[in-house]
Every structure is written in C-alpha cells, then in structure tokens.
C-alpha cells in the first residue's frame, strides 16, 4: 500500500497506526524569522544574467534549522546542442519554470564523470561539490514550459538537451549539510552592485580557500530518479480548488535522500479581515512562489495563544505535519505579496494572511527533513484528482475529521 494511501486511510479512521503526529515536538528552527524576496529583486538578477552572460545566481540562502535553503534564478539562452551533464552530491534542487521552453534529461547513471573544481563559483556558493559528465545512461527526457516543476535529488544528473526558447526558472536548493553559505538580503543588495562575474584570478584564489569542495563526496540520494510535475497537473488542482472551495493540496511528495520534499498548490479566496488562526509547523518548512493574486502575509516566531493542532486534521496528516494554531503573532512582520514573489517560512515560524484582495494562488514547496509525512507519487496524484479532494485537502472545505 502506498504511503499516501496509508495516510488517507488513517484520516478516514481505518486501522492504520500513524503515531508520529501524537508526540510533543519542538520546532526545528527556534525563533526563526521568515524571509521575503520580491519579484523586483529576482528581476534584477535576471537582467544582470542577460547583460553579463551569467547562467545561475543565488539570490538568498537561509538557515531553516536542519538545512539551508537557497533561492536562486537561472537564465539559459536558446541552443540546439546538449549542454554538459551536471550532478550535485549533497544539494538537491527544485525548478519552477517562469518562461521559455527546453528539453531536460534526468537520471543518476552518469557516463564520463569528471570532478568539478572548487574554483567554480557554482560549487562554492550555489550547489556544492559534484561532477560534470558526458551523458546519462537511460535518462528520461521532459519537455519543459512555463509553470512546470522539476525535482532533482542530490546525485541525480541533469542535462539540457536543447533549449527552444530562452528559459528562466526559479531555483530552490536544499542543503542539509549546510555546505553552501547563507546569503542575506544585505549581501544580495551588495552583490547586485557588481557584475556577478569572477575574474580567473578571483576564482583561483577562492578555489584554494575552499579546496575541500573539490573532494569526492558520496551522493546523499543513491541512484535516485528525478521528478517532473507538468503545469497541466498543477492547473487541475487549481481548478478543483476553485470548484470545491479547497485551499491547500499536495501535488507530489518525494524522497530526495536526507529529506522528503513536497510540491503543493494553494489557492485562497478574498479575505477582508485577518484569518482566525495563525499557522505554525514544528518540523516542516515551506517556500511559497506566488503565481497570481495579491495578499498581505504576517510572519514571526513568537506566537500568542498557541493551541495544538489535532492529528486528525488533513493538514497535519498529509501536508505539513505537527504544529500549532495561535491567535496572533507578537512583533510579526507583514509583507505585501504579488505574483513572482517568494517567501520562505522555517519550521516553527508563524504565518497568517491578514488580507487577500481578490485571491492568491501559489506554488508550495515543503521541506520535511524528518520524513514525517507520506510520499505522493504521480499515480497517487492521478487517483486523487479523480476525487473531489475533500479528504486530502487542508483548509476551506477540506477534511475536518473530528
């Protein structure tokens, strides 16, 4: 029986033992703030990429307790020939395609591996130690277009076989070994004052300081496949959310070695007064990438009037694990969200929508280092979409088992 179906049976009260949620957990990130990255900042990196022939840039990297999370933006120009294969030993990635079209090949069985030197900026500040390679044996190819999502576990090769139109995508990186440094908002602003390009002398000097990153590391996900979630599938969840008054739906949840990663779709309707409850998740961190709409989101770790969420809730069982509701956030910080903005919410950090102008829809990426939530495969998702979603969704008309 698949893990996702086990979770569904437990939710329905059938005799499945899922005792992990009943424990008293402490947040894995103690008193951590949330992080907001506006679309304007992302666009500034894209503009620099086009001007200075840069492919991959880290915009921010934050500590969420059991992992660092990187948020970057990637720009690749149209090309007819395959790029070299890339593989990262310790850092996993999620792509959310913003524009353009390309064919991406994924697979763990690499041919002609060659160690990436620490003099490469990507090794030092973006995706850590790894290899280049000539090709991927028995790789699977996917045609990417705007709205698609790709999950690439550490150790899995990835190669753009062709790029039909210039492609740009949001990059989310998972770094449980914390091998890549954090990058603050102030450091991002300082970075944008420069060209973003290292001279050969600068690269050699930095490579000498971080020579250990050129060493061999065992991939943290051994022979793991990549995962592709097409925009059409995500839009099917959006359509169902609107039709059935659902809020939070898990589209996929996969094992990437050191953690599980969930990809979800959240749609919230108009809100004229603050939500009644602040949400907080003890073990699962979240990243939002706003697809459409506008809203005001309040973030902060100091919660007032906490009440434990019961394990019977679909959100606890299937979406974001154990945690609390609360009446308010003491000294919270509010952000105005618009399409293209990114938010990171560490485990233990409260979050509350205080206003939604018409609606807000966002891609949800969940980071589950304790693997407390069930996996959800493509076939699980297809089966779920044949239902009305009320048994598996959180919030709205989703499951509220007493």
What residue spans do the PLM features occupy?
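A short beta-loop-beta micro-motif enriched in histidine and acidic residues
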Residues: 65, 80-93, 106, 112-122, ...
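A short hydrophobic beta-strand segment most commonly corresponding to one strand
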Residues: 165-181, 358-374
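Positively charged n-region of N-terminal signal peptides that target proteins for export
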Residues: 1-4
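Fold-core signature of tandem repeat domains
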Residues: 62-64, 69-71, 104, 144, ...
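A short, N-terminal "cap"/entry segment at the start of jelly-roll beta-barrel domains
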Residues: 20-90, 182-280, 378-382, 389-391, ...
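Short, conserved beta-strand element in jelly-roll/cupin
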Residues: 89-104, 108, 119-131, 282-297, ...
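Conserved metal-binding segment of the jelly-roll/cupin
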Residues: 142-163, 335-356
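Bacterial N-terminal signal peptides
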Residues: 7-16
């Amino acid at each position: 029986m698949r893990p996702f179906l086990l979770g569904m049976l437990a939710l329905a009260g059938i005799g499945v033992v899922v005792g992990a949620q009943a424990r008293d957990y402490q947040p894995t990130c103690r008193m951590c703030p949330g992080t907001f990255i506006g679309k304007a900042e992302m666009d500034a990196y894209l503009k620099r990429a086009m001007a200075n022939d840069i492919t991959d840039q880290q915009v921010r990297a934050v500590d969420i307790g059991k992992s660092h999370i990187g948020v970057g933006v990637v720009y690749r120009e149209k090309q007819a020939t395959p790029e070299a294969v890339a593989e990262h030993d310790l850092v996993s990635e999620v792509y959310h395609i913003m524009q353009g079209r390309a064919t991406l090949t994924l697979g763990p069985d690499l041919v002609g591996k060659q160690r990436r030197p620490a003099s490469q900026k990507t090794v030092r500040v973006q995706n850590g130690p790894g290899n280049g390679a000539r090709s991927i044996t028995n790789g699977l190819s996917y045609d990417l277009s705007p709205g698609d999502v790709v999950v690439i576990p550490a150790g899995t090769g990835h190669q753009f076989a062709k790029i039909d139109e210039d492609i740009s995508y949001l990059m989310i990186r998972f770094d449980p070994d914390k091998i890549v440094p954090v990058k603050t908002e102030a450091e991002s602003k300082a970075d944008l004052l420069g060209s973003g390009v290292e001279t050969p002398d600068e690269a050699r000097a930095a490579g000498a300081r971080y020579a250990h990153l050129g060493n061999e590391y065992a991939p943290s996900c051994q022979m793991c496949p990549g995962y592709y979630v097409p925009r059409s599938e995500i839009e099917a969840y959006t359509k169902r959310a609107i039709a059935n008054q659902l809020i939070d739906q898990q589209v996929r949840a996969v094992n990437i070695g050191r953690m599980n990663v969930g990809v979800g779709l959240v749609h919230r309707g108009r809100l004229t007064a603050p939500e009644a409850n602040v949400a907080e998740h003890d073990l699962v961190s979240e990243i939002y990438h706003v697809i459409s709409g506008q809203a005001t989101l309040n973030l902060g770790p100091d919660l007032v009037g906490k009440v434990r969420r019961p394990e019977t809730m679909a959100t606890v069982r299937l979406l974001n694990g154990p945690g609390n509701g609360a009446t308010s956030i003491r000294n919270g910080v509010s952000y105005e969200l618009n399409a293209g903005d990114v938010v990171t919410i560490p485990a233990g950090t409260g979050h509350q929508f205080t206003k939604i102008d018409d609606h807000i829809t966002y891609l949800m990426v969940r980071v589950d280092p304790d693997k407390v939530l069930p996996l959800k495969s493509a076939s699980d998702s297809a089966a779920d979409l044949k239902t009305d979603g009320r048994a598996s969704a959180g919030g709205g008309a989703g499951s509220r088992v007493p």
